[in-house]
């Protein structure tokens, strides 16, 4: 293997993974939301609206939009909404395994939050594609067309960016509407920071460069392009430009400084944990919150690009209007990342085989070692003869507090 194939080629340094003690949704009928309702039993709260929503890596974003729309609607009763996005990224082919990962993000949605949605600044791009899908119910692994998946992702970046630009043009300008409160000729400068869905970190860099490429077409008068583009830029058809290496190289270089300042802070979790599928873009948002000092982040705009194969995608933006310091303290992200245990690749292969043996089994006791789990971690304890699941919570020294029949992921 060539040195740097994954650390440079994919931009990854570490990857989270799971054994058979953790699961991704596997019931074609029962919602994971119904399982999580056990957490509210002690309070007697059964009046909690909502159910699972999914479309590959886009499900969490759809749930987030639903939650925000509920809070803004006539149906809202004054309570907060809770969005839980989590999954396990696992591939059968050896070449794709380094793009795996796992994780879960929970988001509390309500009024007077330190992060607020920009009004009217949300755009989507959706169409039919078979780039990545899970039609084989006998396997946990997806069916993936790798090259098509990259093409679809970049097509979605283009489509969302153009639609977002059209939305911005219809919104009444207001102070602070662009990066640092200045009027920007290039739309990319609308965002002080950006978070992307991150199948791998190198694709994020290419996607940000793609935004700059689009700006070179729509805003050629920007000083960024007058002084930054080579005199003989390649003449490539727009559709072909997505996979053109010369175009990619030019705009990767042109966007390098902006990327380092505005996007690199979002890659802390993705580069350390890998692809979290539906939680990925929100792990990138968390990375920004935990990497940029609260005082520096306040007043800034964060753009988020969410993508799910099949395909569904959206570009939207948030403004930081309050102190994010409390979030940083509660997340305790850096300590939690540092506390993880590093294991050999052979251990990962063993865990993958363990998961294969466990898939769709009943009367099954998982093999994964719970001694390696941190206190407070939920894990699968048993699957009975009717596929009903029992979970437990790892105590300080031994497991305790069983819950049953569902799925809980952790990073």
Residue ranges of model-derived segments:
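Conserved catalytic cysteine-centered active-site region
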Residues: 1, 18, 29-80, 214-280
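Condensing-enzyme catalytic core mediating Claisen C-C bond formation in acyl metabolism
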Residues: 1-26, 96-179, 224, 228, ...
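Phosphate/pyrophosphate-binding loops at sites that engage ATP/ADP/AMP, CoA/4′-phosphopantetheine
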Residues: 25-28, 160-190, 209-214, 232, ...
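Acidic, glycine-rich active-site loops and adjacent beta-strand->loop/helix elements
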Residues: 27-30, 55-61, 84-90, 112, ...
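A generic local secondary-structure boundary/capping motif
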Residues: 70-73, 93-98
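Short beta-strand segments
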Residues: 81-87, 108-110, 120, 197, ...
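Long, repeat-rich segments with strong aromatic
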Residues: 190-207
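C-terminal catalytic subdomain
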Residues: 236-245, 260-342
């Amino acid at each position: 293997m060539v040195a740097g194939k994954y650390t440079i080629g994919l931009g990854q340094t570490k990857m989270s993974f799971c054994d058979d003690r953790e699961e991704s949704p596997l019931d074609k009928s029962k919602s994971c939301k119904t399982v999580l309702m056990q957490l509210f039993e002690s309070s007697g709260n059964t009046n909690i609206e909502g159910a699972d929503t999914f479309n590959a890596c886009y499900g969490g974003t759809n749930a987030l939009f639903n939650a925000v729309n509920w809070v803004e609607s006539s149906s809202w009763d004054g309570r907060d909404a809770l969005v839980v996005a989590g999954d396990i990224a696992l591939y059968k082919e050896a070449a794709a395994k380094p793009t795996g990962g796992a994780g879960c993000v929970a988001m509390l949605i309500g009024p007077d939050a330190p992060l607020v949605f920009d009004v009217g600044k949300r755009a989507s791009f959706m169409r039919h594609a078979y780039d990545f899908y899970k039609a084989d119910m006998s396997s946990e692994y997806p069916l993936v067309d790798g090259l098509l998946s990259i093409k679809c992702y970049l097509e979605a970046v283009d489509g969302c960016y153009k639609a977002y630009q059209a939305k911005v043009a219809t919104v009444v300008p207001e102070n602070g509407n662009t990066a640092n409160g200045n009027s920007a000729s290039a739309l990319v400068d609308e965002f002080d920071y950006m978070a992307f869905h991150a199948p791998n970190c190198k694709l994020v860099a290419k996607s940000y460069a793609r935004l700059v490429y689009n700006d070179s077409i729509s805003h050629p008068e920007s000083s960024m392009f007058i002084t930054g583009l080579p005199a003989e830029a390649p003449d490539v058809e727009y559709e072909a430009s997505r996979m053109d290496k010369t175009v990619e190289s030019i705009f990767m270089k042109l966007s390098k400084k902006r990327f380092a300042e505005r996007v690199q802070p979002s890659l802390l979790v993705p580069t350390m944990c890998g692809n979290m599928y539906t939680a990925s873009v929100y792990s990138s948002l968390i990375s920004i919150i935990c990497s940029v000092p609260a005082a520096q982040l306040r007043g800034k705009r964060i753009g988020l690009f969410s993508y799910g194969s099949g395909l569904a995608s959206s570009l939207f933006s948030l403004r930081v209007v309050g102190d994010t310091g409390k979030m940083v303290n509660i997340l305790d992200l850096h300590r939690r990342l540092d506390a993880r245990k590093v294991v050999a690749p052979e251990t990962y292969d063993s865990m993958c085989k363990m998961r294969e043996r466990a898939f769709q089994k009943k009367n099954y006791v998982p093999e994964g070692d719970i001694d390696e789990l941190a206190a407070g971690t939920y894990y699968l304890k048993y699957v009975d003869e009717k596929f009903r699941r029992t979970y437990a919570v790892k105590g300080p020294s031994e497991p305790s507090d069983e819950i049953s029949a569902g799925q809980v992921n952790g990073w």
